[in-house]
Amino acid sequence: MSEPVNKVKQTQQQVDDVTNTMHIAVGKMLDNQQKVSELTDKSENMKQGAQQFKKKTNEIKRLMWCRNIKLTLIIIAVVVLLLVVIIVPIVLKFT
């Protein structure tokens, strides 16, 4: 009679062990799922940040190009003005 009781206790112990193992595995799975969700959120945020960064850099690039063109035009105007100031009196003197 003690042998069936021992088998029942042994089987119950095995069931308890499997149950504990399953609880641990499910807990780890839920933790991993949470981590994957967090990583997905972070990667989406990084993607949005990269898109905003690219947009901003293109805006700045365009702005700097415009400033460069303006500066070039100002330099050309100053050079032309200087040439006019220098050449016109010389031409008038010889005419």
UniProtKB/Swiss-Prot annotation:
In this protein, which residues make up the domain named v-SNARE coiled-coil homology? 7-67
* Inducing stimuli: Regulated by the srfA transcription factor.
Gene3D superfamilies given in the database record? 1.20.5.110
Q: Which UniProt keywords apply?
A: Coiled coil, Cytoplasmic vesicle, Membrane, Transmembrane, Transmembrane helix
**What does the record say about its membrane topology?**
Single-pass type IV membrane protein
Q: Name one GO biological process term.
A: hypotonic response
Which stretches of this protein does UniProt put in the Cytoplasmic compartment? 1-70
Question: Where in or outside the cell?
Answer: Cytoplasmic vesicle, Secretory vesicle membrane
The record's annotation in Pfam families points to: Synaptobrevin (PF00957)
InterPro entries linked: Synaptobrevin-like (IPR001388), Synaptobrevin/VAMP (IPR016444), V_SNARE_CC (IPR042855)
Transmembrane region(s): 71-91
- Source domain of life: Eukaryota
GO cellular component assignments = plasma membrane; SNARE complex; transport vesicle membrane
Q: Which loops or segments lie on the Vesicular side of the membrane, by the record?
A: 92-95
Instruction: Give disulfide pairs as residue numbers.
Output: none
What is known about what this protein does?
Involved in the targeting and/or fusion of transport vesicles to their target membrane.
Q: Which family does it belong to?
A: Belongs to the synaptobrevin family.
Q: What is this protein called?
A: Synaptobrevin-A
Q: Which source organism?
A: Dictyostelium discoideum (Social amoeba)
Per the record, the gene is sybA
